[in-house]
């Protein structure tokens, strides 16, 4: 068969059996060739690369380029080709074959060889093309640089032909074509070919709604290997104006490539090109740009861009991923109420919560912005939309939101629901959430319930869970429960990590348990982990507690080598060391040497300046903190307000100014929530010093004003739980006003907080199968925690002659397990004398101070009664001389009256009563005789 006959056969087959095959004009829209292509015989191409290197592309450049290329392939309309009808004015195949340009020769040869196979499906056709390329390379390796252009044109023709016959193929099949073209070194031609693919061939390829495009990895490879992708993309929009969707896909994919690589400036430039020039604003592109701004912490710019986009395309406001980004901005940035308002507005307009992720993020945002009243209504809305489709993540987000609010009732309710409806293996993550809220961790009931469920369901826990539990119980200073839970997890095979050893050491340092501190120091040394970062920080704390400068220097050397991120902590410990040594100027010198002091450093410096009575320096410190952009926290507020209050009337005015400036309603949620201050005692403690100072100055009006400010805050913010210092200050205020009712209310509040936070945990009932009960009562570290509060309230009761109530409340505290110090015991004796109960006072002196057990504790080497009497008359005596003097005066009065009233109102002659004292307690009798 001759070649001419073959051409006629092919032409007849296409002409009479199918519509005319109209190849796309090969050069009218074809761009400049790659820089790697050089055509020695065609000098007209030498300047074509200038177009690809230009920063801007205009219409005249494109036209001039097209004219150059068309001139090369100029042919006569009278030329007859066996491949095309006479009416076709396109370039004949014969002219391509006879061209002196090697690229055109390769293309002509491939078309000549592969035209008969256009009827094949894509993959068989690709196999034929690959065979052809391999044979051509074997025959002439020099044509390798000419193959990509020919390959691209061949498939452009093939796709057009197939599309005209309603042929479709999958993205996976097309991706194989592009991968082969990439292997040939034609990355630029991949983008050209993609821009020419008919939309009907594979609609999936022109979907701009998703960044996870089927050809994403191929595009990424191309963008890496193209010298100037932005310019090429702009050129494609000029050369292929009808391929608008394909070009938008390329722009969007390039945006994703840039933002992933961190080239944000180019990304902004490309998005501006899309948004302003081409008026493209797909969900994906908008999300990419907002994400890129968020990664750079440019939250305000991200919000501004969002506003511009929704002004043009309001539907974008309903996109769940963009909505989630807005909520992310509102929760991670210092303060982005605009982002939160936009997100809430979008949810409100849509009248639905679009996704699980958005709901979870929304819960966190509501907590941050102190909008706790919206949590439960939104939960109901979520329930209505998703019809009880509560996933473990959703339960976690709901319970976490309630935990951060301190709403114990609803925490219990939703936790119980989560146990029934979700996987408890996920619920164990709530332990970390409990750790971040002292409202829950100090109450500890939820912690015990969660541990009980973990044990019952035999859910595996890890080292992190052990560290959290140790921290929770050590925060309560409940060492028995902490040791019990440590043993329980150890029995389960959970290894005690370095962080766990650090937490244990921290707990014993806090409890001042010297024996246990030495025990664990020995374990840490044997394990060789003294230079672990977390252990080293606890050793710093031990050095601070013991005021051991040598140990602190050793820890400093370790920190400089292994803990570069812990320099702030080191500076904090060093400042506190000098403060405890009363070297206040040295502490300030350390502060001045810190390059970027944090809020803790500022708080310590403020406390030092307050103790030095340097009001001017304190004001300058406040201004410096503001100028450096350090937002005040609960800790810094307490430090500054307390320090100002120590500076007299002028300082009190500054405290009031500082308070009113920083305690604005819109700032409170940021300042006082479990995320920013683990210790929830900060909000009320902030008011304690002000109330105390105003009360001591007799300015009751201002004291009441401060108290009402807090009560207003407390009524609207369930994250704030009154602490004992605040209750004492408030109680002192009403005691000074002789308001028995309100004083009693604050006293009851003190006992309520104490019963929640200071009572031992029945941990044995949770983890011990032997049913050995835990020691009940007050945690040893808190046995004397209520002495100051009790002294204030009992003194008030004595001043208003409410001795019966005083007796009741005294017994009430003793039954709870609290202990009174010697100072309060001396006052108790005086109060009994005020109530004309001499016999009860003498019995208390004997039982508390002069029992044989107490004398043995106080004077282990007492050799005689005279030495005991000498001790109790010395300044070191726990029984004050003033107390003995009051007893002696009362006895002298009884001698004058000739009788003493004992229990049940019985009157006893004074002489007989003194004889009884001498017989039963000779030491007391002789002691009183010496006064």
Swiss-Prot record:
Disruption phenotype: Impairs growth on galactose. Decreases the association of cox1, but not cob1, mRNA with the mitochondrial small ribosomal subunit. Gene3D superfamilies: Tetratricopeptide repeat domain. GO terms for cellular component: cytoplasm; extrinsic component of matrix side of mitochondrial inner membrane; mitochondrion. The keyword Ion transport does not apply. This is Mitochondrial cox1 translation regulator ppr4. PPR repeats lie at residues 247-277, 282-316, 429-461, 462-496, 497-531, 598-632, 683-713. It is found in: Mitochondrion. Residues 1-16 form a transit peptide. It holds the Pfam family PPR. The gene is ppr4. Keywords: Activator, Mitochondrion, Protein biosynthesis, Repeat, RNA-binding, Transit peptide, Translation regulation. RNA-binding translation activation factor that as part of the MRH5C complex specifically recruits cox1 mRNA to the mitochondrial ribosome for translation initiation. The keyword Mitochondrion applies. One of its GO terms (biological process) is mitochondrial translation. It comes from the Eukaryota. GO terms for molecular function: mRNA 5'-UTR binding; mRNA binding; translation activator activity; translation regulator activity. Component of the MRH5C complex, composed of mrh5, ppr4, mtf2, and sls1. Proteins mtf2 and sls1 form a subcomplex that serves as a scaffold to bring mrh5 and ppr4 together. The MRH5C complex associates with the small subunit of the mitochondrial ribosome. InterPro entries: Pentatricopeptide_rpt (IPR002885), TPR-like_helical_dom_sf (IPR011990).
């Amino acid at each position: 068969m001759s070649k001419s006959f073959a051409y006629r056969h092919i032409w007849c087959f296409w002409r009479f059996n199918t519509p005319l095959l109209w190849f796309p004009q090969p050069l009218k829209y074809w761009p400049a060739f790659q820089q790697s292509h050089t055509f020695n015989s065609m000098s007209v191409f030498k300047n074509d690369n200038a177009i690809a290197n230009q920063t801007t592309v205009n219409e005249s450049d494109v036209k001039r380029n097209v004219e150059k290329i068309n001139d090369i392939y100029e042919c006569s309309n009278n030329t007859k080709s066996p491949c095309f009808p006479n009416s076709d004015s396109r370039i004949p195949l014969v002219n391509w074959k006879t061209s002196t340009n090697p690229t055109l020769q390769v293309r002509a040869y491939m078309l000549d060889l592969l035209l008969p196979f256009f009827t094949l499906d894509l993959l068989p056709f690709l196999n034929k093309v690959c065979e052809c390329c391999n044979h051509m390379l074997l025959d002439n390796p020099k044509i390798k640089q000419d193959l990509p252009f020919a390959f691209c044109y061949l498939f452009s023709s093939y796709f057009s032909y197939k599309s005209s016959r309603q042929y479709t193929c999958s993205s996976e099949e097309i991706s194989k074509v592009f991968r082969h073209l990439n292997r040939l070194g034609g990355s630029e031609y991949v983008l050209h070919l993609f821009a020419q693919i008919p939309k009907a061939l594979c609609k999936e390829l022109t979907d701009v709604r998703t960044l996870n495009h089927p050809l994403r990895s191929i595009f990424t490879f191309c963008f890496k290997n193209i010298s100037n992708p932005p310019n090429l993309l702009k050129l494609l929009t000029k050369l292929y104006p009808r391929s608008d969707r394909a070009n938008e896909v390329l722009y969007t994919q390039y945006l994703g490539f840039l933002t992933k690589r961190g080239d944000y400036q180019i990304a902004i430039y490309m998005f501006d090109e899309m948004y302003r020039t081409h008026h493209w604003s797909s969900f994906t592109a908008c999300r990419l740009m907002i994400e890129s701004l968020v990664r750079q912490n440019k939250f305000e710019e991200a919000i501004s861009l969002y506003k511009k986009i929704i002004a043009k395309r309001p539907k974008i406001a309903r996109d769940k991923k963009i909505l989630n980004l807005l909520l992310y901005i509102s929760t991670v940035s210092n303060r982005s109420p605009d982002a939160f308002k936009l997100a809430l507005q979008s949810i409100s307009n849509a009248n639905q919560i679009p996704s699980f992720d958005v709901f979870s993020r929304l819960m966190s945002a509501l907590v941050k912005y102190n909008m706790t009243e919206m949590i439960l209504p939104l939960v109901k809305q979520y329930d209505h939309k998703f019809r009880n489709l509560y996933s473990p993540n959703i339960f976690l987000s709901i319970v976490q939101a309630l935990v951060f609010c301190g709403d114990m009732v609803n925490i219990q309710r939703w936790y119980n629901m989560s146990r029934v409806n979700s996987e408890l293996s996920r619920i164990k993550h709530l332990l970390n959430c409990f750790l971040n809220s002292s409202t829950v961790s100090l109450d500890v009931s939820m912690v015990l319930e969660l541990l009980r469920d973990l044990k019952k369901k035999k859910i595996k826990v890890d080292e992190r869970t052990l560290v959290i539990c140790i921290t929770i119980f050590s925060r309560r200073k409940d060492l028995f429960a902490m040791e019990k839970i440590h043993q329980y997890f150890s029995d389960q095979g959970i290894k005690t990590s370095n962080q766990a050893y650090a937490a244990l050491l921290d707990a014993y340092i806090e409890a001042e348990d010297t024996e246990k501190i030495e025990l664990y120091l020995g374990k840490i040394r044997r394990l060789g982990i003294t230079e672990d970062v977390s252990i080293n920080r606890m050793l710093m704390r031990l050095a601070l507690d013991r005021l051991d400068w040598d140990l602190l220097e050793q820890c400093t050397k370790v920190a400089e080598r292994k803990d570069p991120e812990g320099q702030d902590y080191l500076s904090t410990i060093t400042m506190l060391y000098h403060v405890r040594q009363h070297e206040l100027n040295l502490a300030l010198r350390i502060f001045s040497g810190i390059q970027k002091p944090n809020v803790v450093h500022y708080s310590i410096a403020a406390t030092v300046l307050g103790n030095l009575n340097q009001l001017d320096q304190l004001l300058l410190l406040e201004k410096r903190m503001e100028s450096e952009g350090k937002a005040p926290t609960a800790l810094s507020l307490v430090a500054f307000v307390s320090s100002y209050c120590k500076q007299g009337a002028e300082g009190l005015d500054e405290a009031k100014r500082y308070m009113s400036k920083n305690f604005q309603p819109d700032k409170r949620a940021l300042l006082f929530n479990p995320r920013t201050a683990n210790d929830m005692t900060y909000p009320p403690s902030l008011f304690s010093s002000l109330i105390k100072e105003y009360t001591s100055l007799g300015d009751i009006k201002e004291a009441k004003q401060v108290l009402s400010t807090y009560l207003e805050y407390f009524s609207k913010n369930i994250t704030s739980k009154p602490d004992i210092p605040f209750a004492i200050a408030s109680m002192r205020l009403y005691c000074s006003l002789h308001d028995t009712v309100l004083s009693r209310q604050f006293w009851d509040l003190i006992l309520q907080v104490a019963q929640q936070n200071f009572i031992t945990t029945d941990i044995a009932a949770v983890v011990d199968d032997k049913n050995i009960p835990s020691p009940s009562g007050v945690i040893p570290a808190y046995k004397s925690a209520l002495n100051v509060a009790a002294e204030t309230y009992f003194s008030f009761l004595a001043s208003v002659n409410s001795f019966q109530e005083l007796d009741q409340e005294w017994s009430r505290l003793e039954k709870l397990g609290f202990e009174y110090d010697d100072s309060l015991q001396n006052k108790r004796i005086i109060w009994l004398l005020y109530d004309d109960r001499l016999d009860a006072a003498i019995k208390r002196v004997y039982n508390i101070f002069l029992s044989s057990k107490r004398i043995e504790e106080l004077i282990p080497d007492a050799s005689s009664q005279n030495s005991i009497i000498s001790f109790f008359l010395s300044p070191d005596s726990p029984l004050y001389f003033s107390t003995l003097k009051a007893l002696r005066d009362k006895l002298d009065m009884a001698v004058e009256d000739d009788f003493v009233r004992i229990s049940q109102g019985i009157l006893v002659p004074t002489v007989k009563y003194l004889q009884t004292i001498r017989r039963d307690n000779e030491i007391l009798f002789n002691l009183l005789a010496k006064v």
